Amino acid sequence: MINPSHMKSDFLIKVMYAIVSKYKIILALYILIQVIFIFFFPQEYRSDALYYFKLAEECYQSDQFYPAVQNLYEDYLVAPFYINIIILLLHIYNSTITISLFNLLVNLLQLFFIYKITQNYFDEKTARISLIIYILYLNTLGLVLLNYSELFFTLLIVSSIFFYSKNSILLFTLSGVLLGASIGVRPAGWALLISYLIISVYHIFKEKKLVFKPITVIAGMLFFILLFGSFNYFHFGKFIFTATTGPVNLLLGANETATGGFNARVYDKGNAGYIAKPDTMTFTQTGEFYQKQATNWIKVNTIKWIGLAPLKILHTFGYDDIAISSLAGTAEWNITRTIKFLTNDRNMNDILPTESIQIKVLYFVLQIVHHIYYFLLIIILILWLINNFKKKLFTESSLIHLLFVLIGTIMIVITVGSPRYKYPFVIVMIPFIASYLQSKLLTKNSIE
């Protein structure tokens, strides 16, 4: 008697085998689709993407780098290394298309490093699976059209990990330089440094001798930080090498109106983040004010602050519309807004009211298909974790990736959650998702 479950399993294996075996064609189509989106379906920047662009454009027009004199009285400084890259791009050609073409290059480089990391850790077959997993994760395609720092930041992280895995002092130093550059984009880069240090300390105690690898990595990191910080000091007067968003993120996750995610009510009059005359305070003074407000609240409401941790995790991992809406051309509507609207209004016709039925269908299909894929990746990752715990299969390489995700998640729990914050975590775990699929489903098949 034929077992239906075996038939389904065999069918799934055949489908996966067919997809992976055509990886070159899929990669070519992926590049073509990106080019088509960039030139024929450019996206209007909103939210942080628009804010980053305005910062870069103001500096470009005044022939300055970021931060500039006019940024002294901002609430905080964001992604200084990334903003300066955008300024240079605008000097080449002042258009958002220039940024998208840069993102296309970043995306392909990131894909290359994920492919090579997987190849180094496992084999060519698994590397091809990781390539397909990466391509099918549509947020990356959407990020190419936008101006967020996540794509560039993650490239710096994965390239640092790649060179860290090589046996060369020069490449260890390069790994450190890239690590320093990632910190220049987002403070979350510190999570990777801590991961490297934990692994190094383990080796020192295990082998009872000094390990030179972390020393060269730290030297490379400090080289970048000193170089970039000095560059900013000479044109801005302050040694700035990373974003100063830590205090405001801490406050967003530690106040009476905190929800676990971004909630602008904290800035309303009478609330913890309200500043009567913000234009009179420098970013340093504002940061000190936010940090004082947050830490005072945490001291008084420690249990409540700890209780917000699950909500921060939910806001980060519970849904995954980082850039999916942009692919449907509906950036004003995302999955969060849609759920809130349906909860309150419960009228499907009021969602995307100015769009055609075709756009509405495309929007919902993309959201549903992508979220099924996203949660499938999470399930496979959990299965990989369980399997490795049971069989004690963790290697130094896998632990670096895991520690980066764990420490990065702790940083989120301390501050505030956002679906964008997990993007690097998903990308760095793709090699291990691919390895689990290869070992459990495709081992008996030859992928040529």
Indicate residue ranges for each PLM-predicted region:
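Membrane-interface transmembrane helices that cradle and orient dolichyl/undecaprenyl
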Residues: 122, 158-174, 201-206, 437-440, ...
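Membrane-interface alpha helices of multi-pass inner-membrane proteins
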Residues: 87, 130-131, 163, 172-187, ...
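Membrane-interface anchor segments at the N-terminal boundary of transmembrane helices
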Residues: 98, 311-401, 405
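Membrane-proximal stem/loop segments at transmembrane-domain junctions that anchor or position
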Residues: 241-344
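Transmembrane-helix signature of polytopic, membrane-embedded enzymes
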Residues: 20-23, 96-98, 102, 111-136, ...
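Extracytosolic helix-loop segments that constitute the early lumenal/periplasmic catalytic or substrate-binding loops
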Residues: 50-75, 81, 256-270
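Loop-to-helix entry region of an early transmembrane alpha helix in multi-pass inner-membrane enzymes
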Residues: 80-87, 92-109, 143, 364-371
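Multi-pass, polyprenyl lipid-linked donor-dependent membrane glycosyltransferases
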Residues: 47-50, 77, 98-106, 129-159, ...
